[in-house]
Amino acid sequence: MSVIENAIKRLQASRGATAPGQESAFDVLASVGSARRRDTAADSAPPARAIPINQDALRAAGLLPPPHQERELAQQYRQIKRPVINRALGRGMPAVPQGNLVMIASAVPGEGKTFMSLNLALSTRLEEDVTVLLVDGDVVNPRMSQVLGVQDEPGLLDVVRDPSLSIASVVLPTEVPGLAFLPAGRPSDNATELLASVRMHQVVVQLASEDPARLVLFDSAPLLLTTESQALAQVAGQILIVVRAGQTSQHLVFEAIETLSEEKPVSLVLNQCVRQPHGYYYQYGSSGAAGGKPSGT
């Protein structure tokens, strides 16, 4: 039995078994990958402030796979996103309360959560009737904002700190159709308190309600590293925990899950897992370059 299966078994034993016919809140989604960019052109030109999505720069940062891995990993992300979308929009199952607010976290740094956040966003925006807002919720280490070159732009913390600031003014379109980005914003010594505030709840409710077909994906700080991530978990409707295969210990996975509400769906995503389905070896979450860069923080 794997480390992840052991963690889930212990957690389910402590929290009670799942009722017959009910989907467990603690699914193992055993893969990560990337989606290919849409081939068709946008119906209209992108806005002037649209954030450029430089694939070469993102690959160099370890946040996109190399071209030769795209097809295999794209298929894996299709498997990952489906239950997330179904819970968010109530497709084939009752919608999860605030299920379109999805937090992507890890127990500790180096698991690949930022890689997961970006590539899940790119895959999900390919849906015909779904748009995506990717939020840099790692206000301690806003790597996504830095890589996209918007680390100095007002963002999440600013709009929570200043109620007079329009939410729409800090949501930035990107050059990728169907994908927008909300930077982390300017750092704050009381970031945890801001994320746990009533104002934060108001902000995420507005983000969730503006477009019923929008998924809001939060790239969060590691759960066991900061208190900011635990505050962010309070407003998310569903949570994905990225676990690096062969490295993350069982007790860390279990400890991370224990910080979360029992009432929210929590899924584990096994990252950098080598499998051999249909004769292929897949390695998830790695840049794939010689020497193997980590897939993000």
Language-model-detected regions and their locations in the chain:
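P-loop NTP-binding module
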Residues: 1-297
